[in-house]
């Protein structure tokens, strides 16, 4: 397993929480339009937006990058497998690696997990003590 894949590894409970948050995003959007948005809705919306912004997808131009992020989001929102999404501009394995990275960023921005940068700082701090 490569270092990039290990970097975005989430435990099963965290994966379920993040997928449920993204899966319920359509309901959150309806509440927002109706003016009944909760604080958690705002936090979840911001976390999803930040995750989309954090996705690097090296080798893609901006249009292809936005398309790929849209497909990743659609896959999680509607629980659709790669095979049902149509044109994704990448192979199945790479798509699921990107999807895992997206879930990691959502969890990180919601505060469910500690970010990689913060985690490495904590390790460095412990090493110096």
Q: What role is predicted for each listed range?
A:
Residues 1-62, 114-129:
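N-terminal interaction/assembly modules
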Residues 5-8, 88-92:
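Short, aromatic/basic-enriched loop-to-helix "N-cap" motif that marks the start
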Residues 58, 90-91, 103:
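Generic recognition of cysteine residues
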Residues 60-80:
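Short amphipathic alpha helix immediately N-terminal
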Residues 78-91:
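Helix-turn-helix DNA-binding module
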Residues 95-109, 113:
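DNA major-groove recognition helices of helix-turn-helix
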């Amino acid at each position: 397993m490569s270092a990039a894949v290990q970097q975005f590894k989430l435990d099963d409970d965290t994966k379920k929480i993040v997928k449920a948050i993204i899966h319920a995003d359509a309901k959150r959007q309806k509440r927002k339009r109706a003016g009944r948005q909760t604080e958690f809705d705002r936090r979840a919306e911001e976390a999803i937006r930040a995750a989309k912004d954090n996705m690097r997808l090296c080798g893609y131009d901006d249009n292809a990058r936005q398309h790929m992020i849209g497909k990743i989001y659609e896959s999680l929102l509607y629980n659709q497998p790669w095979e049902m999404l149509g044109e994704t501009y990448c192979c199945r394995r790479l798509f699921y690696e990107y999807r895992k990275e997206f879930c990691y960023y959502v969890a990180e921005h919601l505060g469910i997990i500690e970010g990689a940068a913060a985690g490495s700082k904590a390790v460095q701090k412990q090493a110096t003590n």
